[in-house]
Amino acid sequence: MTIIIGADAHGVELKEVIRQHLTSLGKEIIDLTDTSKDFVDNTLAIVAKVNQKEDNLGIMVDAYGVGPFMVATKVKGMIAAEVSDERSAYMTRAHNNARMITLGSEIVGPGVAKHIVEGFVDGTYDAGRHQIRVDMLNKMC
């Protein structure tokens, strides 16, 4: 698994905390951050890289997390979630097979962000009854 991360200028500090934390856990990270670009371009770069390989995951950080979420969900094949708590991050992997999360640096502090990304990257898709919804989501774009 490779985790593709990025941020705009508003999320770069929290992204760096996340990058260092995941690296300390032995995770393979690719950082696509370009602070000269806004959240739309950074998010699209992450989505493109995540969609290249089935087991890639993505994390995008900006000020509030909502904009990158909206961008990511416009791309065919991407299931993303905007999260601000650990349980939602874990459950979006387990029930929705989300491959990307977005976070807001104005919403989530460093400690919670570390727990969020751990829950997300360590979560596994349960499939079963949840596959019906995932199939529905994948047909939408």
Swiss-Prot record:
Coiled-coil segments on the chain, per record: none
Species the sequence originates in: Streptococcus agalactiae serotype V (strain ATCC BAA-611 / 2603 V/R)
EC category name: isomerase
Protein name, UniProt field: Galactose-6-phosphate isomerase subunit LacA
Recorded metabolic or biological pathway in which this protein acts: Carbohydrate metabolism; D-galactose 6-phosphate degradation; D-tagatose 6-phosphate from D-galactose 6-phosphate: step 1/1
Catalytic activity: aldehydo-D-galactose 6-phosphate = keto-D-tagatose 6-phosphate
Keywords from the UniProt entry: Isomerase, Lactose metabolism
EC number: 5.3.1.26
GO molecular function, one term: ribose-5-phosphate isomerase activity
